[in-house]
Design a protein with these regions (language model features):
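Helicase-core coupling region on the C-terminal RecA-like lobe
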Residues: 173-179, 457-528
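Conserved Walker A/P-loop ATP-binding site and its immediately adjacent core
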Residues: 37-54, 109-110
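Walker A/P-loop
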Residues: 2-21
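Conserved helicase NTPase motor core
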Residues: 4-8, 38-39, 46-47, 105, ...
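Walker A/P-loop NTP-binding motif
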Residues: 18-32, 409-411, 447
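Coupling/switch/interface segments within P-loop NTPase motor domains and analogous charged loops
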Residues: 153-167, 171, 254-346
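Conserved ATP-dependent motor core of P-loop NTPases, especially the RecA-like helicase ATPase domain
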Residues: 2, 7, 41-42, 58, ...
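Conserved SF1/SF2 helicase motif Ia
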Residues: 27-42, 414
Length: 528
């Protein structure tokens, strides 16, 4: 059965070498296989480097160049072909590719999806004269300027803008209206917003939507605070019924009474569960001082009711703290949501008026088409001759991109062709353009019913031994420390973190201990 091969490749581990070997192996079996392979990466520079690497190594293998010996040996080992067979096939493949270069598809993710869009333009009812806009910033700037120009004294947008400005002033932040709104408006290009944008715009067409939602959030906030205040009332009621006060308990006002007072004041954060609370949950003896004249009464009361009240409060406190914070954050940002939806609407209107299509909308449009439509139709337009898919820097792939690629991968796998993914979650740096390392981290044994085989490239050939050893120790320690913090707060290991750093330790091919690492500790200052 065909499989998806996943290479986890840390820095210096031979990722480009491995990709080129896997590509050339397909050509050795079939010199025209390049017509059925799609290799994608993130930058034009990486695309050019990959093309150059494949072509130069094909030539090197053909003529017996020493620089291509490592490629030849790996291909011999993994294909079972003789050296002569590999050299001949490499020469034939190189000749075919040079005379059929347009079908040698190593390209960026963006350029691939653009080509798909061109093939689907008619079905998507996109005008043939449509202007493709590459610069989101310029479009956003025009939209915000247009929105501000339209503001009138009674405009709800003006009220939202004023709220936004007041919030910035309260936080001692810059409040240049135009620049700040443009900066905030970049959120409309985030995939999280794009996926929910249409539903949000539909709901906000009702002018009462935000008002009703605000009312619901306020009611939930009040309900949570009253519920937690109820535990303080129970605690005080039990003490009062036995002629006791919180000062009679162990450590007086600094003891367990402090916990319940915080609940009464609406403080539900995790740090109020301190050592005193832990001890009082464990044993009634921690509720009273041994020298207290009411020692026996307090112990009996703790066993009969106070410990139970504390346990009940703790069962709800953590969950209610999350709900309370969610309510308050939502209330804080409701006006921003309205403002964002208005900016989005203005961008769409300007695009329509100027017969313009944003390049950044490509992924979203294809994602919607693939999700709602007939995938076989999409494959027909893309070109069903793509069998093998190779994706480089996969840790920076976005959810929408993965949704689009996944169907292409599954189509190739169903035809008996293997596909390849290369990435390293520890090097994910493209969150600003919706990259999601969690996709690679969550690829386990199967994709649908097709098996996934994971290989880790563990040898770092780029760095010196001392540098490798330092990195092994520092990142192992850092991952363990963060997992400890996570476990302390949530009571369980952070499985995503553990999985991401399970392969952090690299090996060195060198026996000599060379390399130098210097660590400097910086003191925090007002700016940082």
């Amino acid at each position: 059965m065909s499989e998806l091969l996943v290479y986890k490749a840390s820095a210096g581990s031979g990722k480009t070498f491995t990709l080129a070997v896997e590509y050339i192996k397909l050509l050795i079996f079939n010199p025209r296989a390049y017509r059925q392979i799609l290799a994608v990466t993130f930058t034009n520079k990486a695309t050019a480097e990959m093309k150059e690497r494949i072509l130069s190594q094909l030539y090197g293998i053909q003529i017996g160049d020493k620089d291509s010996e490592a490629y030849l040996n790996r291909i011999k080992e993994e294909t079972g072909k003789t050296e002569q067979e590999i050299r001949e096939a490499a020469g034939i493949a190189l000749s075919y590719m040079l005379h059929d270069y347009s079908r040698f598809r190593v390209e960026t993710i963006d350029s691939f999806f653009q080509s798909v869009m061109r093939n689907l333009a008619r079905e998507l009812e996109l005008s043939p004269n449509l202007n493709i806009e590459l610069n989101n910033t310029e479009v956003l700037s025009d939209a915000v300027d247009s929105m501000i120009e339209k503001l009138g004294p009674t405009s709800p947008v003006l009220a939202w803008l004023l709220d936004y400005i007041n919030e910035r002033i309260a936080d001692d932040k810059r409040w240049n209206v135009s620049d700040e709104v443009k900066s905030f408006g970049r959120n409309i290009f985030d995939e999280g917003y794009i996926e929910k944008g249409e539903g949000l715009r539909q709901r906000l067409r009702n002018p009462n939507t935000i008002k009703e939602y605000r009312k619901q959030l306020k009611a939930l906030e009040t309900e949570i605070l009253e519920q937690m205040k109820g535990f303080y009332d129970q605690f005080e009621g039990e003490l009062d019924g036995h002629a006791l006060t919180a000062d009679d308990l162990k450590n007086g006002s600094r003891g367990i009474g402090s916990y319940f007072r915080k609940l009464n004041n609406g403080v539900l954060s995790n740090d109020i569960r301190n050592a005193t609370v832990e001890k009082c949950l464990e044993d009634a003896k921690h509720w009273a001082t041994k020298t207290s004249p009411r020692y026996a009464d307090i112990i009996n009361l703790a066993n009969s009711s106070l410990i139970q009240i504390l346990e009940d409060a703790e069962k709800l406190r953590s969950k209610n703290n999350l709900l309370l914070n969610s309510c308050r954050l939502s209330l804080q940002h409701l006006n921003k949501v309205q403002l964002l939806a208005n900016i989005d609407e203005e961008v769409r209107q300007l695009n329509h008026d100027n017969n313009r299509f944003l390049l950044s909308d490509t992924n979203a449009l294809l994602h919607q088409l693939v999700k709602d439509g007939d995938s076989s139709f999409v494959f027909e337009k893309i070109g069903t001759n793509i069998h093998n898919v190779m994706i480089d820097e996969f840790q920076d792939t976005s959810r929408m991109q993965w949704g689009n690629f996944k169907l292409l991968l599954l189509e190739g796998l169903s035809q008996g062709a293997d596909s390849l993914i290369v990435g390293d979650v520890k090097q994910s740096i493209y969150r600003w353009r919706n990259g999601d390392w969690g996709i690679l981290n969550s690829l386990n044994d199967h994709i649908e019913h097709f098996p996934i085989r994971v290989k880790t490239l563990a040898t770092n050939r780029r760095s010196e031994t001392n540098v490798i050893r330092f990195n092994n120790r520092i990142f192992t320690a850092a991952a363990n420390y963060l997992n400890g913090v996570y476990k302390q707060q949530l009571g369980k290991d952070c499985e995503d973190l553990q999985k991401a750093y399970a392969d952090v330790v690299q090996e060195s091919p060198r026996s000599t201990e060379k390399g130098y690492v210097k660590v400097s500790f910086l003191e925090p200052d007002e700016e940082h």
